[in-house]
Amino acid sequence: MNLLIMHPNFPAQFLYLAQYFARSPRNRVVFLTKETNGNRLKNVTIVGYKPKREPTQGVHPYVRPMEQAVLDGQATLRAAVSMQEKIKFRPDVIIGHTGWGSTLYMKDIYPEVPLIGYFEWYYHAKDSDMAWWPDEKPSIDDMLRLRTLNAHHLVNLQACDVRYTPTQWQKSQFPPMYQEGMHVIHEGVDVDFCRPNPGAKLVLKDKGLDLSDAEEIITYVSRGFEPYRGFPQFMEAIRIVLGRRKKTHVVLVGMDRTCYGAQPPKGKTWKGIEEERGGYDKERVHFVGHLNRLDYQKVLQASTVHVYLTRPFVLSWSMIESMSFGCALVGSKTPPVEEVVVDGENGFLANFRQPEHIAQRIEELLDDPALRARLGKAARETVLARYNTNDRVKELTNLIYGAMR
């Protein structure tokens, strides 16, 4: 089989799928991408694409994302045409992330080739991540911008032969006419790598961090420290917890940036705002930045309690991975988390908007080792049953072969 995978970042959600197909000499796997990030995969040919220009300066802000998607779509089309000549590759099936436009025109160059679209999110001005906070009211400008932002998603929904998304919650965001027939297949996590290590001690030599003597470690992971992922609420919760417990440490993995939602006031960052507020023992709060996979593993294997908070938005890999590590989890009582976590069975749920409740749930777990062990064991069992990448790749493989019939 000639399999073409498309994502602007390599390998992203398609790591395990690419590895699976690349193992067989009967398959040829090509990954069309904008950014390799220095990564390579055995037996996977990487082909780059680059838009010819940036979106038009001064273009209406509503349509700037659509123009960027068109530019990406044109760039991938040119790369696909070039592949046929330069590396003699013509796909039997195409699978790609539809969010940035790279898949837009694949059916125009390969009308007979099945196109499978990975659909991550459909935007709404209310009843979702936007206007979720009680005092938030989207402006008319926000509403019009978000409606227009869905334009290239709608083109992809119409163009793809097969559609899938990772969670039921994400599926529920799409228009009803496209939900019908949309498959739910999570990419899964590596349960062999994300495994418990009872008694693990946390030492990050590259970060100069030695918590091998720490009795309690609270962990938090996010690509960016920002409101969408409950960073301000987490910081307020740990102020409460650290004020009561003098031997507890907190480790935060992620970058001082905003990936989603509103930017902080000009010249500031959300992390900087919390540091200015203070009110916590900075000697026991450790911002370790972005970590390599082995150090990330060390953090979660040594975690006493892991906290994951999110608005009603895309569910992060890190939450599923923390459960696979057997962490005792406190998650936000929001739809994407509730799809996975049953309060008191495989984790705790807390009110996102109430830091006092988050702190209470953290302390309930810190005070009860037997409860932590029970919830952590159940959390890993949940992942083994529903999010094991080996099973999810098989499910996705069946989807691919089904599309080719």
Task: Give the label of every model feature segment.
Residues 254-258, 263-297:
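Nucleotide-activated donor-binding/catalytic signature segment of Leloir-type glycosyltransferases, i.e.
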Residues 169, 188:
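Carbohydrate-associated surface elements
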Residues 53-63, 113-152, 192-201, 212, ...:
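Acceptor-binding helix/loop patch of EC 2.4 sugar-transfer enzymes
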Residues 161, 298-314, 327:
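Acidic donor-binding loop of glycosyltransferase active sites
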Residues 328-331, 341:
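Short hydrophobic beta-strand element within catalytic cores of glycosyltransferases
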Residues 357, 364, 371-386, 392-398:
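A short, well-ordered alpha-helix in the C-terminal region of glycosyltransferases
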Residues 205-229, 235-240, 250-251:
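Conserved donor-binding/catalytic core segment of Leloir-type glycosyltransferases
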Residues 343-344, 348-355, 364-369:
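Conserved acidic donor-binding segment of nucleotide-sugar-dependent glycosyltransferases
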